[in-house]
Amino acid sequence: MKKALTALIVAFCALLSLCVGASADESAEVYPYTFAFEEFWYEDAVALEDTLPCKAALLMEAGSGRVLFAQNETAKLPIASVTKIMSTLLVMEAIDSGKIRLTDMVTVGEEAAHMGGSQVYLEVGEQMPVSDMLKALVVVSANDATVAMAEHLAGSQSSFVSQMNARAAELGMSETHFANCHGLNEEGHYSCARDVALMTRELLKHPLVLEYTQIWMDTIRNGAFGLANTNKLIRFYNGANGMKTGFTDTAKYCLSGTAKRDGMQLIAVIIGADTSEIRFASAKKLLDFGFANYAVKTPERIELEPVTVKRGKAPQLAVTYDPPAILTEKGGKAPTQRAELPESVDAPVKKGDTVGRVVFYSGETEVAQVPVYAAEDAERNSFTNVWGIILGIIIGRK
């Protein structure tokens, strides 16, 4: 029995290595925050003691977009299959918008079936549900599944790539240009560590993707084809929840690794490491640094003075706000808060209407802002009500 079990395990491992395939390309929450900015903070970035052994690197806290470490972060470099973060983002947006469903069947075309690199060996005319295509794309970085999804969404890979570049522009990815949807070496295909963090941050806004990025081992084709995640952080790093690995001879070993602890979501980008081990060790070092030195905390709500109401039944309006979770240095001072409210508002006002804002500061630097909203309705005085008030005053004087 023991020998049979051992043989079964060996056979399964062999099957996994066959399914992944040898190739040049590696096969190895919606945030509730409302922040005052979308750009990175470089003035506060805290450097590690030494330079990481890779071409470029970046550590970012996803909720705020604050950069905690940056190394050669805007250099245009090949990123291999890390490209698929943008491909996955477009798929997730299509799912969330109702354009496609996880149960929809994808028919494999000629281009997808003849892709090289890491793959799940799709055949022309084969049909597979979107959910399994996503597993293949995200878990084992399958180029054929990526192209199949691109064709399913946009009609052709070239049209899909145009959408990728348009979305990159919308996200402010100024040092990025995609020439394909999978990341294999191609002229004019490049990105940078900062831009990889930007698209990773956007993808994290789609919670569904984490159901795929956190898969360690799974199957497709009704259990006939095994999958093993190329991202080793998922199995070995506490809190790891994504995102994408990549490798080509030109790009070397790349990674956008994500992890979440105690409500803080970090993104560690590594581009151009010489070995897979260096890639994961460097990402771990960045993540360890972030979790050791920073935390996300929600400040206490301060009591706000009511706002005067003009032409309202009641003279004042109660207002409130919801403090956001804010990134702070461990052991540092809590951010200060400053309410910005009008002297008065005109009735009518509906409960929930925005009437001002509260701004949060770290020293003199604005770090976040949230709206101040009406805690109740403020009805407008009608002519009848006004006349009644006047009449009451007159009668009261007698």
Stretches with model-predicted labels:
Residues 1-5, 79, 130, 383, ...:
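Structural motif marking the loop-to-transmembrane transition
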Residues 2, 10, 43-45, 254:
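A generic local structural motif
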Residues 2-24:
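Sec-dependent N-terminal signal peptides of Gram-positive bacterial secreted proteins and lipoproteins
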Residues 3-4, 85, 261:
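Hydrophobic alpha-helical segments, especially transmembrane helices
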Residues 10, 18-20, 61, 83, ...:
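Generic detector of short, well-ordered, non-transmembrane alpha-helical segments enriched
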Residues 15-16, 97, 298-301:
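Residues in and immediately flanking transmembrane alpha helices
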Residues 22-207:
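Active-site-adjacent loops and short helices of periplasmic peptidoglycan-processing enzymes
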Residues 173-177, 185-398:
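Domain-terminus/edge residues, biased toward the C-terminal soluble/receptor-binding domains
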